[in-house]
Amino acid sequence: MIKTWIRCLTTEVRYHQPNAHGRSLVMSVLNSTVTKREAKDYLNKYTDENNHHYCLVFLRHLSEYSDNVLSGFSKTVSRIQTLGLRPILIVDPLCQDISYQSQRLDNHLHDQSLKSIIVLDPITIGERGSIDVKLPILNPHIIPIIEPYQYHEKEAFKKLAGDPSRFLSSLVSNLPINIDKVFLISKYGGLPSVERHTNSHVFVNLSQEYRELRNSYQNQLEKLESIQVDNTEKNLVESLQLFLNQDKILSNSDQLKCHMEDLEIMNKTLSVLPHSSTGLITTILAGSKLSDNNPLVYNILTDRSLISSSLPRFKRSAAAQSKSWYELPSSNVEEEVTSANDSVLVTTVFKKGIDIHIFDFRTLTDDNSIGLPPSQATQTGKSDPVSKKLDLNKLNGIINSSFKRSLDLSHYLGRINGNIASIIVIGDYEGIAILTYEGPKDKQFVYLDKFAVAQKLKGSLGISDIIFNLMFRKFPHELIWRSREDNVVNKWYFQRSTGVLHLSLDLGNDDQKQSIFKLFYYGNPESESFHNVERLRDYAKYVRDITPSWHK
């Protein structure tokens, strides 16, 4: 401890210009992994010397990592600092021999020429329950290593924090600094997803998914625990199998409990931070990578996951093994793709999330919407005064600003009203999707008629991914949309589709028209409809002939 203070106090307090290695790191990563928009956002945010940005790194299972592993991770901490964030390392209250592990971590940081200081009791609990956080952040290049203790004035005694999520949220809510990132390092990696064959969820929108995930893990845990307890009416073979699998059952239970704690940590911590803050869970091996697909470094630069969460499941495996996908960074390091070492498979990104409203009115009326044009005004007498109404004024506004054209709302509603499949609204109309029923009366299909995201939020918060995920879950078997042939987003659309058709093609029986659109369709590629020429002809004909509703 004395050596740590000597190192910190003898460090000159001044601004450190990035060295050649630092500049090279920033430029190489910017050139290889991010879009122009992301590069601009990163440079605007993290190269301003007057604004200080911090990231919390919560280390679980610290005692289980070898010195070689910790040495590799210390290099990532150095990269985080070089990229403009000030890391604050926090030791898990459940860690064995906290003092020794903190000193061990401190030594590895020092070996990387990093300056760190161990903070023994960062939180003081007053006699009346007040919380005071004291964190000696001496200069941009001194890294605090926080031990999970709280000093209680009433008892005049230092206690180990019991609940990691409460400790972290108390710490964060009382720190007067800008915390942009919350990184959690766990030997188990991100939260497991059934849809991804127990590989990690790519992205979690907590306001939408927290409760569902918590209940799912709780149900799985109860099933595992019931297997251990229920020995009644088991024959000798079943009892023997249970005995032989006991260690595996206990291991799975421990892992599930850890994932539930990680989910709680992210939910409580991000709930007291701004909406712009991002959480991320990964393994220490993934977080130690020196290649471009280090999920911590990548998220600092892009504020997103290594791969898009809205990629269809049948494309994710291909994307994980191919570097040609738009969302995947290139890497000079060729590695065998396995769940143990592939960053994509062990990383989950979190956002506090934004409100989502889904309106499933087939027909819009004055009872369920606001701003209905006079030509469409009707009342059913079935109004629910509690239910939220669709605001057509705001809906029209985001469509106009996103498409940079003026929608003829009366003409548009005249076409879709009575055939609405669903309308999805994100936040305060910061993202929307309008889905309609199109096609033959006896066999209609769902068509994404309008999709818009506010200009200020394009490429951020994962809004596009959230909308597409919602649509894919709601209409998993058949979903169609079209896009202009010169639309720069078409590559993104292609990755989320099962197939693409040019709408200028000859549909047979002399049915051919010039069209500026491509048709994209989504669903199970093994489904009969996607191998049925007549069904594909229906898609093309009805989507091609939809009349636009823009003011001229």
Curated annotation (Swiss-Prot):
It comes from the Eukaryota. One of its GO terms (biological process) is ornithine biosynthetic process. Coiled coil: none annotated. InterPro entries: GlcNAc_Synth_fun, Vertebrate-like_GNAT_dom. Keywords: Acyltransferase, Amino-acid biosynthesis, Mitochondrion, Transferase, Transit peptide. It is found in: Mitochondrion. Residues 1-32 form a transit peptide. Its main location: mitochondrion. This is Amino-acid acetyltransferase, mitochondrial. It comes from Kluyveromyces lactis (strain ATCC 8585 / CBS 2359 / DSM 70799 / NBRC 1267 / NRRL Y-1140 / WM37) (Yeast).
